Each structure stands twice: as structure tokens, then as C-alpha cells.
Amino acid sequence: MIQILLVIICLAVFPYQGCSIILGSGNVNDYEVVYPQKVTALPKGAVQQPEQKYEDAMQYEFEVKGEPVVLHLEKNKELFSEDYSETHYSSDDREITTNPSVEDHCYYHGRIQNDAESTASISACNGLKGHFKLRGETYFIEPLKIPDSEAHAVYKYENIENEDEAPKMCGVTQDNWESDEPIKKTLGLIVPPHERKFEKKFIELVVVVDHSMVTKYNNDSTAIRTWIYEMLNTVNEIYLPFNIRVALVGLEFWCNGDLINVTSTADDTLHSFGEWRASDLLNRKRHDHAQLLTNVTLDHSTLGITFVYGMCKSDRSVELILDYSNITFNMAYIIAHEMGHSLGMLHDTKFCTCGAKPCIMFGKESIPPPKEFSSCSYDQYNKYLLKYNPKCILDPPLRKDIASPAVCGNEIWEEGEECDCGSPADCRNPCCDAATCKLKPGAECGNGECCDKCKIRKAGTECRPARDDCDVAEHCTGQSAECPRNEFQRNGQPCLNNSGYCYNGDCPIMLNQCIALFSPSATVAQDSCFQRNLQGSYYGYCTKEIGYYGKRFPCAPQDVKCGRLYCLDNSFKKNMRCKNDYSYADENKGIVEPGTKCEDGKVCINRKCVDVNTAY
């Protein structure tokens, strides 16, 4: 009540320029009061569903610094998957899973009219809350808590008073990453971000809320849920230049206690969470990546930590995030940073550039948070896709996997539509009736790899060629306009002229792994080098305990080629005969990859050299 009275007094004295006040983001020392006026703005030809509470498109008008602002908003229809679920635990620790409806949600992306560089990430659940970029500057907006008033506060990041100025960091280290110099030499080959074209990819995410978070929010699952939705809506906005969508498929609350040992040692907690994901979560929930959100203060001022190149790996596609700020953009930036590591992005060096330094992959927290990825991040992500081929994000979900009611005229082909080519004025598809989103008379299809001149291609027509020995070509069925989902050769199928065996669509061989780690001239080291894995030493082992100082365990004699990988590096002035690579950030780096041939008829599985006929 006192807070409401202060706001009313402030508005009476300064109707357009606010005095210091506590808002959702914290204590704001300067803000402007605006009164957004809503104007419905459905796409041309679109029909609003009568049962919807939140429109698919909206428009708001207000003024900032005396300048008219027209904010166009479109619902983020890729924020949730259709099979979105929530799991919590009863007082007797029974697992309870529900599937709440999330189709009619209130989270939007947008832009400012007549500003091509503008962006916006807004929650419209109770007024407008979020941020927008106008004329290159980022503004925050949120409703003032005044009964029966449309008043909102608009302010900049620098107007938020930061209580904690101690430097904070990403927990990922880079002791053995590429040096600055090689990056510098390749900068001339880097394609500018605005010229890049990435195929659309989906990361299906599960967020786990640990017990410290449940306690912090006084067991208020609604508040936690809203907070996570707001953060992920902004994460999606950040990743738009990569054409990546982060779809929330599940939310889990550890109500009665943690299911792993969550400690302040970030590295140990991350490893434990990865092992739990591989042994538990993956067995009951389909997803690509999992995030543990905690309120436990992490060592070394760590805000987040993950495994570099970890995306799609069963025990490595995880991240640990500290809920350290009540500013949505701060949290979204940390999540985007850690997810970048999982996608192969390293910390930026002095040679990396973006529109306004620092960039998102800078190793320390930046105030205000960065808004752009660097040239290096784009280059590293592209190389990651080529090298690791992360299959879990390469295959997009089926249209029905993304939850949203169909809207005819929005140019998104959704469940229940035969086609959608936009408004009648904009449609250029000769097969589609833009007014109804139905196929025209005589047309069999309007989109898809197996659609040609409005007719479904004959059965057996190749629609996706085989990429390599471990891939298979896909062919049209004659019944559908869509190419069948990507399939691969069976595990254990010989590949690369019997140099290896197929494993989950790849042909992992030591030679290619050495080249990827060191240089194009690298080869596999002689057998004597692999005998070092019998030692159980710092650089020679098969398995190790969790943590930096974890004990190393030697390989059995028959398994020496399934532990650390040894290479002969023939690059200029090196000529190292038994070279291996170790990374504190990703302890799997430099280990012989699963499925690699270790002897004729044998492959590496769980760091053991086993018969290929019984391995799969």
C-alpha cells in the first residue's frame, strides 16, 4: 500500500518524469511514465480465434521522450512444444506429471515501426513487461502498480541501481582452447553476421528448478513459471540471428529436496546433473538440452557453467544457472551465453568484434548485458555444425510439436492448415488459396520437398541424398508432400573403406578426431603412445571421478585405445609424437569418441573395446 501511495505522489508531482522507485527490476532512479494504447493488429487475412484470450498480433502506441512509438507484437508461437509437461513431487516423493495448456500464452516478440534495427521481447500477461530497442538504445517497460491505471514505467538499464558490483564470471575455462593468433589469422575469412544464412533449428529444453529455488520463491510455482517463461522468451530473441528457436518442453520442480547433490562447487554439481539427466530424465522426457536453475551461490563468483560442444550428448547437454538477478535480460544473457558454449562457441578474445563490445561470449559479466554475438561466435557455431553434426537440433520438430493455435494468413504452415502463403495480397504460391489456407482445386500440395508444381512427387523420388557412408537417402512416399524424417545406417555398419563403423549416423575414426583436435596434417600416434593410458595419470587414463582433482583410473590392457586419444602432430615446428588434448571445461575433449574402431571388429563403448556385433 505504501508503494502504491509513493507512485501516486510521484505521478502527481512528475506526471511524465518519474522519481526513484522500486520496480520489478529493482530500484530505478529515473524513468518516464507512459500510457500504452492498444490497437489490435492481426495479419492481413488472419482470423482471430474467439476462444483466445491473447491475440496472435497486437499493436501499442505511446511516446518516449516526446517521440511517438508504435510497438508491433507477434506471439512467440515457438516458445512451447505441444507435449509440454510439468513435473513435481508429492510429500511422499511420488512423481506427478501434468500437461497444462500453454497454447494461449502471453509472450511476444516485436519491433518498432519505422525502425529496421528494432527488436522487442514482451510479456503481455498483466500490462507490458519486457524490453525494446529503439534507435539503437534498449529501454525497459513495466506496469506501475496503480489500481485501474494504464501507467507504465519506461527506463534504461543505467537507471537501475546495482547493489552488487562484485565481478562475476562464466564457470567455463578455456586453458586449452585455440590461441588468439589463429583466430586473428582467419578473421579475413569470416562472413559478416548480417550475410549469414542458417537453417532453422530447434533446441527442445527442459528446465529443472532445484529446492533452493522453490524455497526462494516460497513454493510459489506460478511465480517461478512466469519468471522462466519471461527469461526464455528473451533467450529466443537473442538467438534469432542464428535462426535457432528454444522450445520449452518440460519444467520440473524439486519441491521436497534435490534429486542430486547441489553444492557451491559448480563443476561437481554440473557433472552430477549431467549424469542424472542421462540416467533418469532422458528415460522419461524427450528433449535436447536440460538446465538446472539454482539459488545456491556458486564458487569463484560463477553465474553459469556448461560443457563446451555438449549439445545432444546424453550427460553433457546440460547447464547450471544461478538465479542471481531479478532483471530478466540479465538472466537471459547468462542462459544464452552458456547455451552458446554447448553450441561450440568459446569465450571472445580481443580479435572478436560485434556492433558494440563486449559481445555475449565475453568471459565476465558485463553491465549492461551484451546484446549481440561476435564474429568469432558465428564462425565457431558454423564450424561446430560442420564438425559435430548435432543431430538432435538438425531435425526440426513436426509442425504439431510446436504449440500454437493456427492463424490463417501469418505465413506459418500450422497444424490444421493445408497451406499458408500469407495474405491474399502477398501470396505468391500458385497452389494455395490465401483466403482459406486450403489448396486450390486440383492441387495436391503447396509446400514440401516432395511437392512439384502442386503435385506430390512419385514414390521413390529422392528428396534428401545420403550425406556420407552412415547416412541413407530419403525418398518420397507418393502419399505426402514432406520428405520422410532423416534416417541413418544401422550402428556397426562398416564405413570409410572399413576404417570404422557407423555410430548414430557418424563414422568416428581416430584419424579424423586427431585432425579436428590439432591440424590437417595430424595423424594417429603409434601404438606405444596409447600404453600411457595404463598409468591412470593426469593425461593418461580411461575414466576419472567428477571434478578437477578427481582420481584417474587406468585402462585395462585391451581398452587402451578407448581412453585418451594420442596423435602425431606434423604441423610446422611441432612434430609431437604422442600429443593429446585436455580441457577443464569439457573433460570428454581428447577422449576417443564412442563408437570409434579400436580393433578389427571392435568399437569403443563406455571406454571399453568391445565386439561390434554385441555393442549395439
Curated annotation (Swiss-Prot):
Q: Which GO terms describe its molecular function?
A: metal ion binding; metalloendopeptidase activity; peptidase activator activity; toxin activity
Misc remark: Negative results: does not inhibit platelet aggregation and does not promote hemorrhage.
Q: Which lineage ranks, top first, belong to the organism behind this chain?
A: Eukaryota, Metazoa, Chordata, Craniata, Vertebrata
Source species of the chain: Echis carinatus
Q: Which residues are glycosylated?
A: N219, N261, N295, N326, N497
The alphabetized UniProt keywords are: Blood coagulation cascade activating toxin, Calcium, Disulfide bond, Glycoprotein, Hemostasis impairing toxin, Hydrolase, Metal-binding, Metalloprotease, Protease, Prothrombin activator, Secreted, Signal, Toxin, Zinc, Zymogen
E.C. number: 3.4.24.-
State the name under which the record lists this protein. Answer: Zinc metalloproteinase-disintegrin-like ecarin
Which cysteines form disulfides?
Answer: C312-C392, C352-C376, C354-C359, C408-C437, C419-C432, C421-C427, C431-C454, C445-C451, C450-C476, C463-C483, C470-C502, C495-C507, C514-C567, C529-C578, C542-C555, C562-C604, C598-C609
Q: What does this protein do?
A: Snake venom zinc metalloproteinase that catalyzes the conversion of prothrombin (F2) to alpha-thrombin through formation of a thrombin intermediate, thereby functioning as a procoagulant protein. Has a low Km for prothrombin and a high kcat. Cleaves the 320-Arg-Ile-321 bond in prothrombin and produces meizothrombin which is ultimately converted to alpha-thrombin by autolysis.
Cofactor note as given: Binds 1 zinc ion per subunit.
Positions annotated as pro-peptide in this chain are: 21-190
Tissue expression remark: Expressed by the venom gland.
Q: Please tell me where Ca(2+) 1 binds in this chain.
A: E204, D288, C392
Q: Which residues form the signal peptide?
A: 1-20
The Peptidase M12B domain sits at 201-397
Instruction: Give a Pfam family name.
Output: Disintegrin
Organism domain of life: Eukaryota
Spell out the subcellular localization from the entry. Answer: Secreted
User: Used how in biotechnology?
Assistant: Could be used in a hydrogel with the antifibrinolytic venom protein textilinin-1 (AC Q90WA1) to greatly reduce bleeding.
Residue ranges of domain Disintegrin in the record = 405-491
**For Ca(2+) 3, which residues are the binding ones?**
D471, V472, N486
